[in-house]
Amino acid sequence: MTKTRCMHEHFRKIVQRVKKTLRLSASDKSHGVAELDDLPEECVSIIVSFTSPQDACVLASVSKTFASAVKSDIVWEKFIPPEYESLISQSRAFKFLSKKELYFALCDKSVLIDDGKKSLWIEKANAKRCIMISAMNLAIAWGNSPQSWRWIPDPQARFETVAELLEVCLFEIRGRINSRVISPKTRYSAYIVYKKLNICYGFENVAVEVVVGVVGQDLEESCRRYICFDETMDEQFRRRDRGKNLVKPERRKDGWMEIKIGEFFNEGGLLNDDEIEMVALEAKQRHWKRGLIIQGIEIRPTNIR
């Protein structure tokens, strides 16, 4: 079955459910796309809004009925964040856009929220929210000590300032986010986004313990893992007992490095008010560490780059 026929079949089932809800006959004509022509365009738009942005774009290329309905704000208002009006107020570029244009603008460019302490954008295919928590919004051990860390601007960063590690023995970073800020019923991955300076030491073959979980809940040992900021770690180090769970960093398209610190499932919903905490800690190797620049912690749906 071709993708187009699959989409027709998918929508045939949706239309039948909608017609039943609207007390319309579900037995007239064929059971294909043709029966959509019997429905008002607004109703077709509502139907499309219960799918995904990717499906909506495919359907727009399938038939004129879909193409017209997909242009409606009814469709795209369902895909953009509920607080889109406050997002618009923070950016002049968004002010005069249609809902569809706003959706794709938020896919292509992140917008600062929470007084510039977080960055929000949406994933183009499924409208899932992605968030980066800035270093300013993280709890960094000795972060207020000018001998240990300093806060500097970086033209390649999304935020006004980033955190440069000058020198510490205890390396600890903690970040929190409310589950309501991200998409419900979604598995997320969390990443530390950073750069290494030319003079960087103290992280060679050093395993940093990381954990991601819900605040107030006991974390299972399986939630814990180890990362290494040094991408040139040697094989002997990797073969150690905990080396099998050791995560290496990867280079991003924007020039920064990222390293995965864990995953979690966001149940979400109006009654769910969990705080998700992400921790990176290295306190066992009591030697000086220097030369990282931390932009923040990025949270995005698992398997999305």
From Swiss-Prot:
Gene3D superfamilies in alphabetical order: 1.20.1280.50
Pfam families: F-box, PP2
Domain F-box: 33-79
CDD domains given in the database record: F-box_AtSKIP3-like (cd22162)
GO function terms (MF aspect): carbohydrate binding
PROSITE patterns xrefs: FBOX (PS50181)
Top-level taxon of the source organism: Eukaryota
Stated name of the protein: Putative F-box protein PP2-B8
Origin species: Arabidopsis thaliana (Mouse-ear cress)
